[in-house]
Amino acid sequence: MDYDRRYAAVILVVLSMFLHILHSLPDGDFIIQGCPECKLKENKYFSKGGAPIYQCMGCCFSRAYPTPARSKKTMLVPKNITSEATCCVAKSFTKATVMGNARVENHTECHCSTCYYHKS
């Protein structure tokens, strides 16, 4: 009986230490390793011709929530979870001509917004 109490006490101490360490880390520390925030980054390929060309690059996050019952009824393949993804896109941009006659967008401001183009 005394052995069981010590065993339970050790488990509780280890669990509380683990929770303390996990709680003290910044939010999302394990999730976003190596993924920078959504911001402007110089495009080295298009910047060769003179003026720098900037593109929005980085990570945004998605959210998931339970699918509302009325929406589930209209789905061909009903799903319990609905997800909404956001992508790093230009909030504003200017048109620029590079490499003679190629027109590109030179991004001036970025934000996370609805994804319109998905990779297949």
Curated annotation (Swiss-Prot):
It holds the Pfam family Hormone_6. SMART domains: GHA. GO terms for cellular component: extracellular space; follicle-stimulating hormone complex. It is found in: Secreted. GO terms for biological process: G protein-coupled receptor signaling pathway; positive regulation of steroid biosynthetic process; regulation of signaling receptor activity; thyroid hormone generation. Its main location: secreted. Glycans are attached at residues 80, 106. InterPro entries: Cystine-knot_cytokine, Glyco_hormone. Transmembrane segments: none annotated. Keywords: Disulfide bond, Glycoprotein, Hormone, Secreted, Signal. GO terms for molecular function: follicle-stimulating hormone activity. It comes from the Eukaryota. Residues 1-24 form the signal peptide. SUPFAM superfamilies: Cystine-knot cytokines. The keyword Glycoprotein applies. Gene3D superfamilies: Cystine-knot cytokines (2.10.90.10). Disulfide bonds join 35-59, 38-88, 56-110, 60-112, 87-115. Shared alpha chain of the active heterodimeric glycoprotein hormones thyrotropin/thyroid stimulating hormone/TSH, lutropin/luteinizing hormone/LH and follitropin/follicle stimulating hormone/FSH. These hormones bind specific receptors on target cells that in turn activate downstream signaling pathways. Belongs to the glycoprotein hormones subunit alpha family. PANTHER family: GLYCOPROTEIN HORMONE ALPHA CHAIN, GLYCOPROTEIN HORMONES ALPHA CHAIN. Heterodimer. The active hormones thyrotropin, lutropin and follitropin are heterodimers composed of CGA, a common alpha chain described here and a unique beta chain which confers their biological specificity to the hormones: TSHB for thyrotropin, LHB for lutropin and FSHB for follitropin. This is Glycoprotein hormones alpha chain.
